[in-house]
Amino acid sequence: ELGGDVIHMDDFFLPPALRTQQRRSEPGGNVHYERFLTEVIPNLSSGRPFSYRRFDCSRMIMGEEIPVKNNGYVFVEGAYSCHPLFGDYMDRRVFLDIDGKTQEDRIRKRNGEDRLQDFLQLWIPLEEAYFQAFSVWEKADYIIL
């Protein structure tokens, strides 16, 4: 076990008030990158504990404070963690890929059949457009298939 903290990009889900057509047309625009830039990025190199607020998707409101000890490894996980607006804040970039069938099976199990269609028609195409627009695969130090 490495220890350390995990910061989930899903905690920076874009709130409804910011979901404009213009924003959704930007590659990587469906993550609240402004909040990640102010609540996380400046704190990572400090070595001091900090916290950020988690967006609660089930209630569409800001949720609880998430403490980050920041005294060792900090893992930032999620599709949009490599957004170019964040700069070069990572020591290593690891891209984890998955085949379509396994991805669908996992989404179906986690979110149900009804929500699967949302992922297939909206969220996955947005992620794919972001990966392509910003060459996420090419910039990864490691790719795990």
Predicted features by range, described:
Residues 61, 83, 112-145:
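Small-molecule kinase domains that catalyze NTP-dependent phosphoryl transfer to phosphate-bearing small molecules
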Residues 11, 98, 145:
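Active-site donor-binding loop signature of nucleotide-sugar glycosyltransferases
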